[in-house]
Amino acid sequence: MLNSKEFVRELQLRHESAWMNPNVGSADAALTALPLTRADVDDAEARLERFAPFIKKVFSETAADRGLIESPLTEIENMRAWLNENKGAQLAGKLFLKRDSDLPVAGSVKARGGCYAVLKHTEDLALANRLVEMRDDYSVFATRAFRNFFSQYELHVGSTGNLGLSIGIMGAALGYRVTVHMSADARQWKKDLLRAKGVTVLEYGADYSYAVQKGRERAAEDPRSYFIDDENSVDLFLGYAVAARRLKAQLAEQDVTVDDEHPLLVYIPCGVGGAPGGICFGLKQEFGDAAHVYFAEPVEAPCMLLGLASGLQNAICVQDIGLTGRTAADGLAVSRPSGFVGETVKEMVGGGFTVSDEHLFTDLHALHETERLFVEPSACAGFAGAVELSKMTDYLESSGLGAHWENAAHIVWATGGALVPEGEREKYLAN
């Protein structure tokens, strides 16, 4: 295993590499030290339940789940066999795909945090203006009167693509004026889709951090504007954390036991850190020390792992060590991590892995061939973590995971893909 200094050197050399967090402690100790609690996740979950009648009414694809924005958990045995045979993995137990790539509304994990942050702000405005009480039927938010009210307000967000889609789609459905500040990495089809929804898209020839800053500045100019801050938002974070509760129920439905002798290993693609950080926080609340969470990032944009391993959090960016921040995994093309997330998960996340664009496309193609499932390149990052961890016999032995490896459940969190146009899908699969 590499120590933190050696790992940063490997990052500089653009090598695919692994870092195991030396600071990870017990879940109870880590959670107790945080200002956020289970009650905060309870509050977020209840708010999503209140808005379910509105979501069901406006987004018909959520009807089967009664207006909840949720995705399937699918066992991918054929992909597990392929990884073992073709990549030298030693994955025992079961391998699942958490298909946030197919989340309704926005087709990515950002439909969790992004939509929740919009709904939280919406409820705050509605309560402050005495438009509703919490016991009311929230389907009224779909009426013309409510849309007219929210058209007085504007939402701003900086994004590489998927967060902008979730906030743009949900915000427009509620009647807001929405401006998405897009970095140079954003895909054209995502910009086109937002504009088709009536969203204003401002494009910048710079990276994600610059787009976020511009969004923050524009929102500050107007008291009726609200900036959804991907770098520092507690609301986004809690929206993602709710996912762990629903995952717990899905695992129970599939008779998957999670305890000390049946560990749960979760591999999550990471950009600025909000989604994987919130999910990690939620998983530790639900499963404690039986949950082992690992982040996966591109070799050119490993911002969160760089911040964690160096201990500098958001005081360092990937350009500081000679990397570009540019990657085909547009959702992960982030140069500087969230300091809020880094500080929150620094004693919870088990570690992380970096992956080349080439291997993202290899795994994208293999998943489609073995399971007939399509995800976008960013969503494939977790496979590298599952493969590499399975080969780390020293770490598995020292961590105690090796003793229960045959009983483990592995989840690769697929973060996006459903909205990718057919022409783009064909290009990805041909790559």
Residue ranges and their predicted role:
Residues 1-431:
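PLP-dependent amino-acid enzyme catalytic core
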